[in-house]
Design a protein with these regions (language model features):
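Surface-exposed loop/turn motifs at beta-strand-loop junctions within extracellular Ig-like
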Residues: 55-57, 106-108, 173-175, 220-222
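Extracellular Ig-like/FN3 beta-sandwich strand-entry sites
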Residues: 46-48, 97-99, 164-166, 211-213
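Extracellular jelly-roll beta-sandwich "head" domains, especially the C-terminal globular C1q domain
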Residues: 190, 201, 219-230
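Aromatic-rich carbohydrate-binding modules that target alpha-glucans
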Residues: 12-48, 54-79, 116-163, 174-197
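Short, structured interface segments
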Residues: 97-117
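Short, exposed beta-strand-loop hairpins at the edges of beta-sheets
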Residues: 101-106, 206-225
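Tandem-repeat/low-complexity and Cys-motif detector
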Residues: 80, 89-94, 203-207
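Bacterial Sec-dependent N-terminal signal peptides
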Residues: 1-12
Length: 231
């Protein structure tokens, strides 16, 4: 039987689960959004949770246990160790909320968590827009009346020759380039071919495979984007 801390590369985690009193129904699976990123977006109750490699505890279950005692699940990046000890420290949830978002990064052995607040504004800007890379001139998206995390925009995106990165663009939480932004996971991702968003991090940009009128919908909480080429 394996005890103590272990190390496994990220690709060997077939599944990761949240289990414990803080988790609705006792267990919720994390979504694998990339090889090095597992995510949960949803409700957490006051209590504790563990990040486990199986839904139910068994002989092969391992836990991503915080290195610090009483570690709050809301943090900017706390280290964990892999262990088979079911009595190892758990992550603490001290406030109940429907908009928790947790990211587990196996390669960094870190867990980040937050209660996501809706942004006040969201913009489209970049070389593929009519205003280019100018701050103060970005295209404002429209917030959904019923869901403050949902944003839509419809307009022309096309390659503008003669400027830097003529077919690239980004989504910004203000009419300037910092601090808030939503990025694709990889540089030059076709907006029509990937629905994943990443909040903050490296300055990767979206690109176009075709000029035209686009309808774009962003879910800030779930970190997803859907783009349709209207014409």
């Amino acid at each position: 039987m394996l005890l103590g801390s272990l190390t496994l590369p990220a690709q060997e985690y077939k599944e990761l689960w949240l289990v414990g009193t803080a988790v609705p129904g006792g267990a919720q699976q994390l979504q694998k959004v990339s090889d090095g990123d597992y995510k949960y977006a949803g409700t957490l109750q006051v209590g504790e949770l563990r990040v486990a490699t199986t839904r139910k505890a068994g002989k092969l279950t391992q836990y991503l246990a915080p290195m610090l005692p009483d570690a709050n699940v809301v943090n900017r990046g706390l280290a964990w160790k892999l262990t088979a000890d079911a009595s190892s420290p758990a992550w603490q949830v001290v406030v109940a909320d429907d908009h928790y978002r947790l990211h587990v990064y196996p390669s960094q052995q870190q867990l980040c968590g937050e209660i996501v607040q809706p942004w006040g504004e969201l913009f489209v800007g970049g070389g593929a827009t009519a205003s280019g890379w100018k701050e103060g001139k970005m295209q404002l998206m429209k917030r959904d009346i019923d869901n403050p995390y949902l944003w839509t925009w419809e307009g022309e995106l096309k390659r503008h020759e003669g400027i830097e990165e003529p077919a690239s663009f980004k989504f910004q939480g203000q009419d300037r380039w910092y601090p808030k932004a939503l990025h694709p996971y990889a540089q030059d991702t076709d907006i029509l071919k990937d629905t994943r968003l990443r909040t903050g991090g490296p300055d990767t940009k979206w690109t176009l495979s075709a000029d035209g009128i686009y309808r774009i919908t962003i879910d800030q909480f779930n970190e997803t984007v859907k783009a349709v080429l209207v014409k």
